[in-house]
Swiss-Prot record:
InterPro entries: RidA (IPR006056), RidA_CS (IPR019897), RutC-like_sf (IPR035959), YjgF/YER057c/UK114 (IPR006175)
Disulfide-bonded cysteines: none
Gene3D superfamilies reported in the protein's UniProt record: RutC-like
Gene Ontology MF terms in the entry: deaminase activity
Family affiliation: Belongs to the RutC family.
UniProt name for this protein: RutC family protein in vnfA 5'region
Organism: Azotobacter vinelandii
One GO cellular component term noted in the UniProt record for this chain: cytosol
Short name of any one Pfam family annotated for the protein: Ribonuc_L-PSP
Amino acid sequence: MSKSVINTDKAPAAIGTYSQAIRAGDTVYLSGQIPLDPGTMELVEGDFEAQTVRVFENLKAVVEAAGGSFADIVKLNIFLTDLAHFANGNECMGRYFAQPYPARAAIACASLPRGAQVEMDGILVLG
């Protein structure tokens, strides 16, 4: 099976040793996105909701670069530095996804890169 790198300048460049996404067959593995502005590579200003919207927009750019849409996402992992934001995260997610929703995990963690409050990665299947 061949694999190819998915890359777009509409999402933040990698800040480590990883690709924005990798396609293997019809499956695309999305690397974690934090709320960095793709133009400045700075963390977006604002509250948890502003950060979450930026993360979804970053993921959307990579998904579209892969030739897909959020309807193709089958698994989403959400990493939160504070589970008190769980309900707000659900509300934000509802703006981007319709039923049937992807499988999902919401995971509490002590900290995230660049002081972000939220990070997401996922898997989509094309075709």
